[in-house]
A protein has these predicted regions:
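Single conserved hydrophobic/aromatic residue that forms the stacking wall/gate
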Residues: 1-10
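Early extracytoplasmic/lumenal segment of secretory-pathway proteins
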Residues: 29-106, 116-117, 222
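Extracellular/periplasmic juxtamembrane helices and adjacent flexible linkers that interface
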Residues: 259-353
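A conserved helix-loop-strand patch within extracytoplasmic ligand-binding domains
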Residues: 104-176
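Periplasmic-binding protein-like
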Residues: 122-127, 189-193, 200-201, 232-261, ...
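Alpha-to-beta junction loops
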Residues: 86-92, 150-152, 213-221
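Sec-dependent N-terminal signal peptides of Gram-positive bacterial secreted proteins and lipoproteins
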Residues: 11-29
Length: 353
């Protein structure tokens, strides 16, 4: 009897060990992924979809930790306000420094964030171009042509969209460069916005209005949005590169208060740092952003510097380098530009009243 009882105990112990090991194994299989939230702007959807998969694999290989990056996209200005008002972003990858400053001013991002990463925390750049319909029926060649009677312009709203602010500043720079006075520049830009048929809240909305809904004659667009249109609708659209534009510097930052609360500081830092690696810089170029690594950017520079682009170059060399681009310093920095042009009662409000 004692032997039988001992045998039963032994069997129960063995079964218990097997159950425990099975449970541990199943727990490992269903291990919860660490979540990282990236709040970005409209025109980055395709790029971050690819980048996030690349980063998740990289991080797992480096640490053994499974990560899931959750994306949020929308007009950059609107996205910044959402984060400032409590949307729990670990990182932001917004259209411009001024939008990140909105979050910083709420105490969620540390002062000096602009120096956390290379090139003023801008891992890729862009510029502003025009997208027109096949054959360029309104003969759009430069900013002056957007003022012509009968030309219907599509652009997003600079009160909600970071890309729209770059659009506005590019137009302002062009007319200023023509030797116009401040009053004359404002009159020219006012006339341009009188021709705006639809003012969407974000860049992707404007692209949809123009390309899918068939409204307007010309779309003022992020360079990458324009090239994606050529890729998605071959033969239907053309890019016109204006003689003057702006150097758009999308800006990235950790949301320090959130990462400290979530314990994701190291993960968030790695996520943003990885944007500067060579393979990712090439991925950015393949998504029609300009890499900040000059050697890699040169790999994608066009030799023709064509002003009218009807298709994606077969050799992948799409970057037009011969453009006069003003950076935000020309306008006194984002604090000054926001106050002058985009604040309540600023120049845009006077123009588009």
């Amino acid at each position: 009897i004692k032997s039988s009882a001992a045998s039963d105990v032994y069997k129960r112990q063995c079964l218990g060990m097997i159950f425990s090991l099975t449970f541990i194994g199943l727990s490992g299989c269903g291990q919860k992924k660490t979540e990282l939230v990236n709040v970005s702007y409209d025109a980055t959807r395709e790029f971050y979809k690819e980048y996030n998969r690349l980063f998740e694999d990289y991080w797992y290989g480096r640490t053994g930790e499974k990560v899931e990056v959750i994306q949020s996209h929308g007009g950059s200005g609107k996205q910044a306000l959402e984060v400032a008002n409590g949307l729990g972003a670990d990182v932001v990858t917004l259209a411009l420094e001024g939008d990140v400053n909105v979050i910083r001013d709420e105490g969620l991002i540390d002062d000096g964030y602009i120096n956390d990463y290379s090139d003023d925390s801008s891992p890729y750049t862009s510029t502003i171009v025009f997208l027109v319909r096949k054959g360029n029926p309104k003969n759009i060649k430069d900013w002056d042509d957007l003022l012509n009677d009968g030309v219907k312009v599509i652009t997003p709203n600079p009160k909600t969209s970071g890309g729209a602010r770059w659009n506005f500043l590019a137009a302002w720079y062009y007319f200023k460069k023509q030797g116009q006075t401040e009053e004359q520049v404002q009159a020219s830009v006012t006339k341009l916005y009188k021709n705006v048929a639809v003012l969407d809240s974000g860049a992707r909305g404007s692209s949809t209005t123009f390309a899918e809904n068939g409204q307007g004659d010309v779309l003022i667009a992020w360079e990458n949005e324009a090239f994606f249109a050529l890729q998605e609708y071959p033969g239907e659209y053309e890019i016109v590169v204006p003689s003057a534009s702006v150097l758009c510097q999308p800006t990235v930052a950790k949301v320090d208060e959130v990462t400290q609360m979530n314990g994701t500081e190291e993960l968030a830092d790695a996520y943003l740092s990885f944007l500067y690696t060579d393979d990712v810089q090439r991925l950015e170029a393949q998504n029609f952003y300009r890499p900040v690594n000059r050697d890699i950017q040169k790999e994608y520079e066009s030799s023709s510097d064509a002003r009218n682009i009807k298709e994606i170059p077969y050799d992948g060399k799409w970057i037009v380098s011969d453009i006069d681009m003003a950076d935000i310093g020309y306008f006194g920095g984002w604090e000054a530009a926001t106050q002058k042009f985009f604040s309540d009662g600023g120049i845009f409000d006077k123009i588009y009243d």
